[in-house]
Structures are given as C-alpha cells and as structure tokens.
C-alpha cells in the first residue's frame, strides 16, 4: 500500500521529507514530492502495475498544471486507456494512475 501525505499552506522545505520518512514503510519502491508556494504532496510507492520511473508519483499531466497522487487500482484501466488513446491522448508510461 502506498503512502500519501500533503499540506496546504506556506512551503516549509523540510516538511515533505519528514512526511515521507514517517510513511516510508508503506512504499518501498520509491518516493516523490511536489510543491508550490501554497501546497505540497509527498508520496511513497508500492509499485504494482508500472514498475518503471514513468509510474512515479506525484504525477503531473502533460501541461504540468494538474498534479496527482493516487493509491488504488483501476481494474478496467486498460479499456479506459484504449478509449483515451483513440481520442488522441498520448501516455508516457503504463500505470493506471496516468489514466486518471
């Protein structure tokens, strides 16, 4: 099971690292962080579907404006992905998170 933590407020440089250390036991396959001036996300990963770096989180969309951290499994993600690809969406990896 992955670990997800976040905050809203003024950026504190050490806060995301503290969050990931506290939840590190939940995600042995990697960790990631994202922040801007007003919010931050910390994610530790238990990789199930896409074991490559392309499945790392927090994940950004192609514009970089939408940031996502997700724990779960979308059982029909292959069908959803195929529908999106027919509409012209280009994927960078093979994770179900990217389909969101």
Language-model-detected regions and their locations in the chain:
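N-terminus-centric sequence/structural signature that marks the extreme N-terminus
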Residues: 1-100
């Amino acid at each position: 099971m992955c670990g997800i933590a976040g905050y809203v407020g003024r950026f504190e440089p050490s806060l995301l690292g503290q969050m990931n250390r506290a939840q590190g036991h939940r995600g042995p396959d990697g960790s990631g962080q994202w922040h801007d001036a007003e919010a931050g996300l910390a994610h530790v990963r238990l990789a199930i579907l896409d074991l490559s770096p392309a499945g790392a989180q927090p994940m950004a969309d192609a514009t970089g404006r939408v940031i996502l951290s997700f724990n779960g499994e979308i059982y029909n993600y292959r069908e959803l992905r195929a529908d999106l690809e027919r509409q012209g969406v280009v994927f960078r990896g093979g994770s179900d998170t990217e389909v969101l």
